[in-house]
A protein has these predicted regions:
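N-terminal cap/lid segment of alpha/beta-hydrolase-fold proteins
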Residues: 1-26
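Short, surface-exposed "cap/lid" segments of acyl-processing enzymes
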Residues: 24-60
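Alpha/beta-hydrolase
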Residues: 34, 71-73, 141
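Conserved alpha/beta-hydrolase
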Residues: 53-78
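Alpha/beta-hydrolase active-site loop
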Residues: 85-105
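Alpha/beta-hydrolase fold nucleophile elbow
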Residues: 108-119
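Short glycine-enriched nucleophile-adjacent loop
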Residues: 122-132
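Accessory cap/linker subdomain of secreted extracellular hydrolases
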Residues: 141-197
Length: 197
C-alpha cells in the first residue's frame, strides 16, 4: 500500500489529502471518502478526538485492491480556506473537485469512482452523484434520517456533555476550548449559514 499526499484545486482553494493506493500497477477502482459535519480532517479526527475512521477504511480497501481519497475539508488541517465561512454548496463543490481530480489519475479507473459519505457527508455524496455522471455508485454511512438542524444541535449537545463530563487534569485544556468555543453556539452559527446558502 502506498499513501501519497495530494493537492486538489477547488476553485481558489487548495484541498490537501491522501490518495491511498494498493500495491501493484492499477488502474484501481477508487472510493472518495466525504467526512461528516464539523471541522473534521482527512482521517475523521477533530481536536481531542482521534477516531481515524476514514484512514482505517482506506487501509482495508487497499488490501482489497481498491484505492481511496480522503481529504481535509476546506479550512481544516492542511487545506486552505475558512471552514466557518464555507457554505454547504462549497463543500459539495469541493467533493466534486475531488472526483474530477480522481478522473485524471493514471492509477484510477475513471469508470469505477465511488463516493462514500458519512453523516452530513452522505448528503454531499448524493449531491455529487447528481452532478457527476461518471460516479459508479454511492455509499451512505449513517445518513441523516431527521431534520439536519435537529441532528446538528443534538451532536453539539452530546459533544459538550461528553467533554464537560471528562475528569482529570488532561481534560482541562479540552474543557477550556469547549467553554471558549461552545459547540452549541458554533452549531447554531453553522445552521444559520446552511439556511442562508
Amino acid at each position: 500500500m502506498i499513501e501519497r499526499e495530494v493537492v486538489v484545486q477547488s476553485e481558489d482553494i487548495k484541498l490537501k489529502g491522501i490518495l491511498c493506493l494498493p500495491d501493484g500497477d492499477g488502474p484501481f477502482p477508487v472510493l472518495l471518502y466525504v467526512s461528516g459535519s464539523g471541522p473534521i480532517n482527512r482521517n475523521e479526527n477533530i481536536p481531542g478526538l482521534s477516531l481515524n475512521n476514514s484512514r482505517i477504511i482506506a487501509h482495508h480497501l487497499a488490501q482489497q485492491n481498491i484505492a481511496s481519497l480522503r481529504y481535509d475539508k476546506r479550512g481544516v488541517g492542511d487545506s486552505g480556506g475558512d471552514f466557518y465561512s464555507a457554505s454547504h454548496s462549497d463543500l459539495v463543490d469541493d467533493a466534486v473537485a475531488c472526483t474530477q481530480f480522481l478522473q485524471q489519475q493514471a492509477s484510477v479507473e475513471p469508470a469505477k469512482i465511488f463516493v462514500a459519505g458519512h453523516s452530513e457527508g452522505s448528503i454531499i455524496a448524493a449531491q455529487v452523484a447528481t452532478r457527476q455522471q461518471n460516479i459508479a455508485g454511492i455509499i451512505l454511512l449513517s445518513p441523516l434520517c431527521d431534520k439536519m438542524e435537529s441532528i446538528l444541535m443534538k451532536q453539539a449537545q452530546d459533544l459538550k456533555s461528553m467533554v464537560m463530563g471528562r475528569k482529570g487534569f488532561k481534560a482541562l485544556p479540552l474543557k477550556f476550548v469547549t467553554l471558549l468555543f461552545d459547540p452549541i453556539k458554533v452549531q447554531k452559527k453553522l445552521i444559520k449559514k446552511i439556511k442562508e446558502s
